Design a protein with these regions (language model features):
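Alpha-helix boundary/capping residues
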Residues: 98, 118-122, 172, 197, ...
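Low-complexity, flexible helical/coil segments
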Residues: 112-118, 137-146, 188-199, 218, ...
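Catalytic subdomain that performs nucleotidyl-dependent activation
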Residues: 71-74, 100, 132, 158-226
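Residues on a specific face of well-ordered alpha-helices
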Residues: 55, 89, 93, 142, ...
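Peripheral terminal appendages
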Residues: 1-42, 48, 52-56, 216-272
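ATP-dependent adenylation/nucleotidyltransferase module used to activate substrates
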Residues: 2-166
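Repeat-unit-sized solenoid/scaffold elements
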Residues: 60, 109-127, 175-188, 222-243
């Protein structure tokens, strides 16, 4: 199964960072041209994935602008706090590194809380903390698509292979996007790319956390997954990992397959 997963996610164990940066920027430039979109939008959390994805997006917009001087498109880097975020300074540091054409802060707190209150009024019970965490992620994507819709832009996703293999994202939340420039990269490769692009150690080494749970803020990805990124990256690079970790990862991959697919229909057989 390991070879199948590696092939399905398009992971390459060895990459040339400089060539890969150029390839991924060119990919975004080509897709902008193909779609006639007027820019790119990405939510910036301060984690390494959105930091690297954001910098690549800004580079792509600048390159497209050089080739098409009449083009009026931009890159919108969007901070999307739920009330007061404990890691707001990291998002600010990421924005300072990325230098997006437009730096926007759009507060999702009141909209998320309003939906939670409407949910309680309709169902007679409060949403669970886990459910509300996914609502936060989906509200952030609603906000990004609202900006993209206003300016005929594309929403950029920051999903990479270590998240894709585990399905560690909210379906139709942070898993929703028009273009995913980090696809096929391991977490280690994303960090290495960030270093090559000049991001600070603070941003590169930030402990990954979705930070969606109000009852357990800052819970790390690895704690929630029950797996380490070191083992996930090793597996995706074709290396052996402990049997228990391999079995858990492969079971998680199979269980989360629906997240990597379009909504299932009667003619689909992949789920059987």
């Amino acid at each position: 199964m390991q070879d199948h997963i590696i092939e399905a996610l398009g992971v390459q164990a060895d990459i040339d960072l400089d060539s890969e940066i150029v390839r991924r920027v060119n990919f975004m430039v080509d897709y902008l041209h193909h779609t006639r979109a007027n820019g790119l939008v990405l939510g910036i959390s301060g984690g390494v994935d959105s930091t690297v994805g954001g910098r690549l997006a800004q580079m792509a917009v600048e390159q497209y602008r050089r080739v098409n001087p009449d083009w009026t498109g931009k890159f919108w880097g969007v901070r999307l706090p739920y009330h007061i975020q404990g890691d707001a300074d990291d998002a600010t540091a990421a924005i300072e590194f990325i230098q997006p054409d437009e730096d926007i802060e759009l507060q999702i707190g009141s909209a998320t809380d309003a939906l939670g209150e409407a949910f309680t009024a309709a169902l007679g019970e409060e949403p669970t903390d886990y459910n509300l965490g996914n609502v936060k992620a989906r509200m952030r994507m609603v906000a990004q698509y609202a900006i993209a819709g206003q300016y005929n832009a594309l929403v950029v996703g920051s999903d990479q292979a270590a998240e894709s293999v585990t399905g560690f994202y909210t379906k139709f939340g942070d898993g929703a996007a028009d273009i995913v420039p980090l696809a096929g990269l391991t977490k280690t490769q994303v960090r290495d790319m960030g270093t090559r692009l000049g991001a600070s150690d603070r941003l590169i080494d930030k402990v990954p956390t979705a930070d969606l749970l109000s009852d357990n803020p800052g819970r790390t990805d690895e704690d929630e997954l029950g797996m380490t990124y070191a083992n996930i990256d090793a597996y995706l690079s074709g290396q052996p990992i402990p049997d228990e970790a391999r079995e858990k990862l492969e079971e998680t991959y199979q269980r989360s397959e629906h997240k990597r697919r379009l909504p299932v229909g009667p003619a689909d057989t992949w789920w059987e």
